[in-house]
Design a protein with these regions (language model features):
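Low-complexity, intrinsically disordered extramembrane tails and loops of integral membrane proteins
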Residues: 1-24, 69, 239-258
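Proline-rich intrinsically disordered, low-complexity coils
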Residues: 7-9, 170, 203, 214
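Generic N-terminal initiation segments characterized by hydrophobic and/or small/turn-forming residues
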Residues: 11-13, 64, 73, 202, ...
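Hydrophobic alpha-helical transmembrane segments in multi-pass membrane proteins
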Residues: 22-63, 81-106, 111-159, 180-235
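Perimembrane loop-to-helix junctions flanking transmembrane segments
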Residues: 64-82
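Acidic, glycine-rich loop-and-strand cores that form catalytic or ligand-binding grooves
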Residues: 160-164
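Membrane-helix boundary/juxtamembrane motif in polytopic membrane proteins
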Residues: 165-194, 238-250
Length: 258
């Protein structure tokens, strides 16, 4: 950031406008990079689900064939098939972790413009690392890391939405408000989830909780889509603002030289 102290009011305004162009240009690039990582993650998740169904059937058939051929019933002959599927899961989670780290890189890079992105990025990494660790755990440990991962996701979403709202406030008040709305709806869904889970353990009211949970899940799904759309719109908004401001500065400089 250039030193504006000692400059005339007009010079200070010019410096701040140039910094605005740089900030919006870079943030637009980082947000678009993050958006592409999100889309890549979704595509990878879909491919993984399809591949998991196919490979699980293949490995299960391989295990069954090995048991029949070996004439064993203790399950040892089927270890190869089980191990093969476990290796597949480890590879999948490794790729997911790499995508997570790539996304965190773009988030943390924006911290030089607005405080809060680094915190959001670190929680984003924590969620990805915990999800990776879950592959190597089982039973109680799995639930423990799954719970921690969910908590990290919640903290990330809150920090990211709040910081995005602040970052867009000077250039796009509409999108800034949309990020604030997203955060509020996220909080409402979390509260509703807690209420439904609580109702599920109350005798005679469990059916109400079971009815409410699927609706809340649909709410989280809709919110996730909205979140992705907002990331894209925010990236596009930053690029538009940067171009508009750069064009205006260029015209003013040309007019001054004429």
């Amino acid at each position: 950031m250039e030193n504006v102290y000692g400059s005339t009011p007009k010079e200070r305004e010019l410096i701040l406008r140039k910094e605005k162009v740089v900030r919006c240009t870079e943030m637009g690039r980082y947000l678009m990079g993050f958006f592409k990582i999100i889309i890549a993650g979704i595509v990878f998740a879909v491919i993984t689900i399809v591949a998991s169904v196919i490979l699980y059937g293949v490995f299960a058939a391989s295990s069954a064939s090995a048991l029949v051929a070996g004439g064993k019933t203790d399950g040892l002959a089927g270890d190869t098939g089980i191990d093969g599927f476990n290796v597949f899961l480890i590879v999948v989670q490794s790729v997911a972790l790499l995508l997570n780290l790539a996304g965190a890189y773009f988030i943390i890079r924006m911290n030089k413009f607005f405080d809060g992105f680094k915190t959001a990025g670190l929680f984003y990494i924590a969620q990805g690392v915990l999800s990776f660790i879950m592959v190597f755990t089982s039973d109680g440990a799995y639930m423990f890391f799954q719970t921690l991962s969910a908590i990290m996701s919640v903290v990330y979403m809150m920090n990211f939405a709040i910081t995005m709202s602040k970052a867009l406030e000077p250039t796009d008040s509409y999108l800034s408000d949309e990020w604030t709305k997203l955060k509020k709806i996220f909080v409402y869904l979390l509260i509703a989830s807690g209420v439904c889970i609580g109702i599920c353990i109350v005798p005679g009211l469990a059916f109400l909780g079971l009815i409410g949970l699927p609706i809340i899940c649909l709410g989280f799904l809709a919110m996730s889509v909205w979140y992705i759309v907002l990331v894209y719109k925010s990236a596009d908004s930053m690029k538009v603002v940067a171009k508009r401001e750069a064009d205006a500065l260029s015209k003013e400089e040309n007019a001054a030289l004429a």
